[in-house]
Amino acid sequence: MRKIIVGSRKSKLALTQTNWFIDQLQALGLPYEFEVKEIVTKGDVILDVTLSKVGGKGLFVKEIEHALLTKEIDMAVHSMKDMPAVLPAGLTIGCIPKRVDPRDAFISKNGKSFKELAKGATLGTSSLRRSAQLLAARPDLQVKWIRGNIDTRLRKLQEENYDAIILATAGLKRMGWDNDVITEHLDESLCVPAVGQGALAIECREDDKDLLQLLAHMNDAATERTVAAERVFLHKLEGGCQVPIAGYATLQENGKIKLHALVGSTDGSVLLKETVVGTNPETVGLEAAERLIHQGAKELISAANKEQQ
């Protein structure tokens, strides 16, 4: 019986996601056993500055990918939104399980909705994507950066100078929080989700054919296609955490992919949006990127990158 070593960040959410996925694999009843190896990433250590200022995407995966390449671990369970658009040589995404709710969750201290927040209220987020879109809708709001795990952020909302915070619905659901803390789910028309939000990425070595065969049982074809369109879009624009960039694709009844794509200025004064429908994920992602580039997305990305230096 082969033992598969599964790498995970030490956070409660990461371990919950990893153990959930291992449970799904064990339910297949195949001759494998699993062991979790906890790994500390740079993003877990640096908590006093915004992600955009310390390297953005990849902060939560680099050390784990190193462990994969050196064969300390055999696979890793990531939040797809933490994954850079390009993987290191020798690694691949072995499967993408079915996506859960991709929306952002708005949580206020007093139960007021986003529209009902008082003028000048303080909103806590560590995401340029969220802050740009919400400032575009409510320029009167004050954005204050907030870091830490889900429990820490919920505690900070109650104890510190925040009127509301934004978190990913998927993470809250996986941790057992949901309607008991969420004031409202933000519709994509107000806040387009991050590329890959709500999906998991199971990463492994591309030469591990045995493991790839096992992971294929857990792949969700619809999620794979929609996330592929989002990631092609992200890759073409070379966007990371340093840039307000968003992409969310859905599969329509006719089998076509519909991608909502957005690039903004960091202050939310400019939001460029495109919606593209098509059959091929790569074509859809590239077209969305090209249309936004035509609108001036590259200039916004360049300006955002300069601001973070």
From Swiss-Prot:
The protein's matches in Gene3D superfamilies, at most eight in alphabetical order, are given as: Periplasmic binding protein-like II, Porphobilinogen deaminase, C-terminal domain
Q: What is its EC number?
A: 2.5.1.61
What InterPro entries does the entry give?
HemC (IPR000860), Porphobilin_deaminase_cofac_BS (IPR022419), Porphobilin_deaminase_N (IPR022417), Porphobilinogen_deaminase_C (IPR022418), Porphobilinogen_deaminase_C_sf (IPR036803)
Q: Name one GO biological process term.
A: protoporphyrinogen IX biosynthetic process
> Pfam families this protein is in?
Porphobil_deam, Porphobil_deamC
- To which pathway does this protein belong? Porphyrin-containing compound metabolism; protoporphyrin-IX biosynthesis; coproporphyrinogen-III from 5-aminolevulinate: step 2/4
Question: What reaction does this enzyme carry out catalytically?
Answer: 4 porphobilinogen + H2O = hydroxymethylbilane + 4 NH4(+)
Q: What else is known?
A: The porphobilinogen subunits are added to the dipyrromethane group.
**Entry function:** Tetrapolymerization of the monopyrrole PBG into the hydroxymethylbilane pre-uroporphyrinogen in several discrete steps.
Q: Which family would the database say this protein is a member of?
A: Belongs to the HMBS family.
What's this protein's name?
Answer: Porphobilinogen deaminase
Originating organism: Bacillus cytotoxicus (strain DSM 22905 / CIP 110041 / 391-98 / NVH 391-98)
Q: From which lineage does this chain's organism come?
A: Bacteria, Bacillati, Bacillota, Bacilli, Bacillales
